[in-house]
Structures are given as C-alpha cells and as structure tokens.
Amino acid sequence: MVNDSISDMLTRLRNAICAQHKVVQVPLTNINKNILKVLQKEGYIKNFEILFERKSGYLLVSLKYNSLNQDKPCLSVLKKISRPGLRMYVRTKKIPKVLGGTGIAIISTSKGVMTGSIARNLGIGGEILCYIW
C-alpha cells in the first residue's frame, strides 16, 4: 500500500516518459483522477480511462508526445511540492507562477483540484500539490 498516491502517480508518469511508453497504469484514487483531468485539460496528456480489475481499479493514462519530434514528451518535469510530512498551503496572492507562466501549479482548493492561474482568478488559495512543465 502506498501512503502518498500523488507521488506514486507522478513517479509512474516520470518513469514512463523516460522509457518512452505510450500508456501507463496508475492506481485509481479521486485525487489522481482529478489531477489527470487538469493535465488533460491543459494538454499535457492525451487522455485517460478508468478500468476496474476485481475489487481495485486503475487509470490507464495515454501520454502525449510532441507532434514534430515524437521522442520529446509534452511533460518534461513533474515536481511534487506538498507531501504528507510537510503540507504547503498558499493564499491567493502567494500562488506561484511556474517558470514565469510556462508551467502550471496544480492546487487542491475548496472548489476542487485546479491550476494555479484558475485559483488565482477565482480568488481562492489551497494546497500546492505539484508543479508541472
């Protein structure tokens, strides 16, 4: 059993990208599903689907690669910020811009999981889950 499902998912995605896999299997949790929805909406992954096997389920994520250079993935860096031992919370004014707006910060708010720019526009803060660029 994994204590931090977000770190596990990010590590699986990172390893699949390094190995240039087309798809990767990730454990099914609500937070993982919501993070993948944000990644799909932002164009970092193609899509994902929910599959059930016996009592447990998993997410099958289709990775997206650059259309010009098939070796270059759309996801290059996945950095976990908040962790179980040290949660990182921010107010609206302190939400960081990742790489000057090139990357995204994924934030868990009271309104759900969203990017940092959307949370900033809505005027709500939350827990910074990870940075992606």
Curated annotation (Swiss-Prot):
GO terms for molecular function: rRNA binding; structural constituent of ribosome. Its main location: plastid. It is found in: Plastid, Chloroplast. Keywords: Chloroplast, Plastid, Ribonucleoprotein, Ribosomal protein, RNA-binding, rRNA-binding. Belongs to the universal ribosomal protein uS8 family. GO terms for cellular component: chloroplast; ribonucleoprotein complex; ribosome. GO terms for biological process: translation. Part of the 30S ribosomal subunit. This is Small ribosomal subunit protein uS8c. Pfam families: Ribosomal_S8. One of the primary rRNA binding proteins, it binds directly to 16S rRNA central domain where it helps coordinate assembly of the platform of the 30S subunit. InterPro entries: Ribosomal_uS8, Ribosomal_uS8_CS, Ribosomal_uS8_sf. PROSITE patterns: RIBOSOMAL_S8 (PS00053).
